[in-house]
Structure formats: structure tokens, C-alpha cells
């Protein structure tokens, strides 16, 4: 009975090749004609993103991608016209142009001249020459878009958001990180507050507004009223929002992840608003909010006890706050308390006693912890990642680290030990 691999049906070969990484898929196709035919089966390339340097004409490039059913493309360098890509990939599903600094409104305008119904995701992050003009083209011809990444596109204004709100009603995820000109007016457009001009993107599930410095609590009011299906909201580094704005968010029952990292005006009062509402958060980040203290941990334990991930790095918390929190947070999986310099071994002992489901903990820069506290933490049954960062070990403690379980990663400055 023949047992050689060459006797396998092409369908079985294709299933095997599907487990290979992209480089090995290509190598397998070069072995023989039978393997080449099997390796070109569309199931082998399902979900693969082609990463391309567009430098010179290659007539076989796009027919080859289409033959394998590849519909996701990342352009690493763009020295040819973008229209070359669009014309070559008739059924393109995802186009990643992040970091293509030479892409202009003119180049994008020549590429998008008719409706592209198949395109679902477009990434223009750090395409710094893009302006509202390009968003007009996108809103007109890419009405099926579900994901739009505009992080670092610093020339976009509220007018661009009005165009998005007018044309992209199917949008589910929008990243506007560091779009410095955006204000409450633009967020109002997205949330459907100007229905006479645009319906809004009312189906949004993820919205990133990181480092949009002009936003105030009014934006949060717009979001709470219009974007009621939002599941993830990133407001990190938005210095213009305050505790009062969190009162608007506190009744968004669909919200699961809220990032308030480095929002300087957020205090214990804001956390109280969140905890007293009807939120069902699974992730909360208030790192570097230096007005957040032990009282916030009491509020979190009272009203946000369903959290799976909690980040409190550099917050003004102590062992007392840890004691208030851990007794109600038994489902917590990730706890980041790096640079919380008031935490001692007592806090770690409380964590080890009550948070048995923890898989990761960040203790970076916790200068008052010792070997005794670490030994308790490393006994957590589910722990996979322990970040010690800049914690200074004595020679004896470095030797003791060798006794830590090999089942999790110990990270210190410049190292990662498993």
C-alpha cells in the first residue's frame, strides 16, 4: 500500500499547506507541479494579507494574487500609482496603506473613481498628506467600509467627519488618533447630531479618539446619545474631558472597554460616576490619572466588579485600596499596577489571596516590593506574565528568580525569561 505523501489527494495537501506560514506556502509550491496546484488552492490562502513593495510593473502580480483568492493587501512602499493596485484587485477586501507618507489626495483621487463595493477595511494611518478631500472620495465610493484607520492623519478636520457621517453608514470601527483639528462638532456629526446634513455612523462599535486634544465633555454627551452600540472607546490623552463627561458614558450598556489613560482631569468622582451607572465593562484603563486613588478602587469593587482587565499604572493607590478592591473582583485576569510606588508586599499578598484567576500582572517600577511579595504572586495558579520592569533585584533575589515557575514569562529591563 502506497503511503508516500505524493499519493495524497490534492484536497488533503491543501489542508496541510493551510497550516504553513506564508513563506513556507510559497516554498511548497516550488516542489513539484502537484504541490504547486494544491498550494494554489484558495483555501490555503484564506485570510492571508499580501505585503507588497510597488516599485516596478509586474504583469503577473495581481493575477497571481487573485488566482489564490487573496483579497487583503498591505502596501509597504508606494512608488507606483495607487490606481495600479485598485485596477489589479477587482475584489479587494482590505487595503492597508499605513505609513505611505507620499500618498496624496491627488493619488487617492485617481484610484477611487468608481464604487468599490468589496472593500471593507482601509488603513490610512500616518498618511500625513491626506485631507478632507480624500475623505470625500472615500465617502462617495467606499460605502461598504466597515473599518477606517486614520490615526496620525493630522490634516483632517470636522468637515472630514461630516463627510464620513454622510457616506459611511456601515462603519463599525474608526480610528482618529492624533487628529488634532477635531472638536466636539465633528464628534457630533459622527453621532448623528446634525441629521439635516448627515445621518451619522450610528453602527460604530469601536471608536479611537486618543490624543484628540480639542475634545471636551460635550463629545462624550454626543457619543452617549448617538453611538449607543459602541463597545470600545479610547479617550487616552484627551486632556479636555473631565469627571462630568463620564457621567454621560455611565449608562452606555453596550460599552465593554474604556481607555482613559493620561486623562489628567479624571478623579475618584469620575470613577464613581462610572461605577454608579449601568456599565458592564470588561476592560478599564485609568493609568497615569494621578487624581485616581484608593477611593476609586472601592467604587470599582462596588459597581465594576465584572472587569477582566484593570490598568492603574502610576495612580495614587496603596495597599488599602487594593484591600478594598480584591474581595469583589474574583474574575479579574489582568492587573497593571506598575509605578504605583505605595504598593508593598502586603498588597501583593492580598492580590495573591483573592485574585486566583489572574493571568498577568504588571509590577514595573513598584519599588517597595520585595522577594517575599513576589513569591506570593508567583504562586498564583493561572499566572502567565509577570512584568517586573525596573524593579532592582539583589543578587540573592536574582538567584531566587530561577525558582519561579517556568510556565510564565518574567519580564525585567532588557530581558524576557520564560
Swiss-Prot record:
Location in the cell: Cytoplasm
Any one of the GO CC terms: cytosol
Gene Ontology molecular function, alphabetical: ubiquitin-protein transferase activity
Keywords: Cytoplasm, Leucine-rich repeat, Repeat, Ubl conjugation pathway
Region (Required for down-regulation of SNAI1): 2-48
InterPro entries (alphabetical): F-box-like_dom_sf (IPR036047), F-box_dom (IPR001810), FBXL14_F-box (IPR047932), Leu-rich_rpt (IPR001611), Leu-rich_rpt_Cys-con_subtyp (IPR006553), LRR_dom_sf (IPR032675)
Pfam families per record: F-box-like, LRR_6
Inducing factors: Down-regulated by hypoxia.
UniProt key word Zinc: no
Regions annotated as coiled coil: none
Gene Ontology terms: biological process: SCF-dependent proteasomal ubiquitin-dependent protein catabolic process; ubiquitin-dependent protein catabolic process
Cytoplasm among keywords: yes
Each LRR repeat, start to end: 144-163, 170-191, 203-225, 229-250, 254-275
Domain F-box as annotated: residue spans: 2-48
Main location: cytoplasm
Quaternary structure annotation from Swiss-Prot or TrEMBL: Part of a SCF (SKP1-cullin-F-box) ubiquitin-protein ligase complex. Interacts with SKP1 and CUL1. Interacts with SNAI1; the interaction requires the phosphorylation of the two serine residues in the substrate destruction motif D-S-G-X(2,3,4)-S.
Cited function: Substrate-recognition component of some SCF (SKP1-CUL1-F-box protein)-type E3 ubiquitin-protein ligase complexes. The SCF(FBXL14) complex acts by mediating ubiquitination and subsequent degradation of SNAI1.
The protein's name in its UniProt record: F-box/LRR-repeat protein 14
Native species: Homo sapiens (Human)
Amino acid at each position: 500500500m502506497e503511503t508516500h505523501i505524493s499519493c495524497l489527494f490534492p484536497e488533503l495537501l491543501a489542508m496541510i499547506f493551510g497550516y504553513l506560514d506564508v513563506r513556507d506556502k510559497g516554498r511548497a509550491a516550488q516542489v513539484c507541479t502537484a504541490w504547486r496546484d494544491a498550494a494554489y488552492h484558495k483555501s490555503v490562502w484564506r485570510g492571508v494579507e499580501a505585503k507588497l513593495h510597488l516599485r516596478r510593473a509586474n504583469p503577473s502580480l495581481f493575477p497571481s494574487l487573485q488566482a489564490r483568492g487573496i483579497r487583503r493587501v498591505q502596501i509597504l512602499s508606494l512608488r507606483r500609482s495607487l490606481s495600479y493596485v485598485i485596477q489589479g484587485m477587482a475584489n479587494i477586501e482590505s487595503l492597508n496603506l499605513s505609513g505611505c507618507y507620499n500618498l496624496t489626495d491627488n493619488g487617492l483621487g485617481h484610484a477611487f473613481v468608481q464604487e468599490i463595493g468589496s472593500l471593507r477595511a482601509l488603513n490610512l494611518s500616518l498618511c500625513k498628506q491626506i485631507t478632507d478631500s480624500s475623505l470625500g472620495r472615500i465617502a462617495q465610493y467606499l460605502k461598504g467600509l466597515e473599518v477606517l484607520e486614520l490615526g496620525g492623519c493630522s490634516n483632517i478636520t470636522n468637515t472630514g467627519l461630516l463627510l464620513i457621517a454622510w457616506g459611511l453608514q456601515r462603519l463599525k470601527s474608526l480610528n482618529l488618533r492624533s487628529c488634532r483639528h477635531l472638536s466636539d462638532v465633528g464628534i457630533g456629526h459622527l453621532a448623528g447630531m446634525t441629521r439635516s446634513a448627515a445621518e451619522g455612523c450610528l453602527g460604530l462599535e469601536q471608536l479611537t479618539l486618543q490624543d484628540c486634544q480639542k475634545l471636551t465633555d460635550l463629545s462624550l454627551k454626543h457619543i452617549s446619545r448617538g453611538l449607543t452600540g459602541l463597545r470600545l472607546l479610547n479617550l487616552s490623552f484627551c486632556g479636555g474631558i473631565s469627571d462630568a463627561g463620564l457621567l454621560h458614558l455611565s449608562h452606555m450598556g453596550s460599552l465593554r472597554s474604556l481607555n482613559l489613560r493620561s486623562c489628567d482631569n479624571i478623579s475618584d468622582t469620575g470613577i464613581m460616576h462610572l461605577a454608579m451607572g449601568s456599565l458592564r465593562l470588561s476592560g478599564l484603563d485609568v493609568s497615569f490619572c494621578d487624581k485616581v486613588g484608593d477611593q476609586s478602587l472601592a467604587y470599582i469593587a462596588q459597581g465594576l466588579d465584572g472587569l477582566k482587565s484593570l490598568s492603574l499604572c502610576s495612580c495614587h493607590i496603596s495597599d488599602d485600596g487594593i484591600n478594598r478592591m480584591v474581595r469583589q473582583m474574583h474574575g479579574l485576569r489582568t492587573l497593571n499596577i506598575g509605578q504605583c510606588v505605595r504598593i508593598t508586599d502586603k498588597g501583593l499578598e492580598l492580590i495573591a489571596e483573592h485574585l486566583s484567576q489572574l493571568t498577568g500582572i504588571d509590577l514595573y517600577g513598584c519599588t517597595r516590593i520585595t522577594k517575599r511579595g513576589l513569591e506570593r504572586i508567583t504562586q498564583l495558579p493561572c499566572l502567565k506574565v509577570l512584568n517586573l520592569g525596573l524593579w532592582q533585584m539583589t543578587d540573592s533575589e536574582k538567584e531566587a528568580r530561577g525558582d519561579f515557575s517556568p510556565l510564565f514569562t518574567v519580564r525585567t529591563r532588557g530581558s524576557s525569561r520564560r
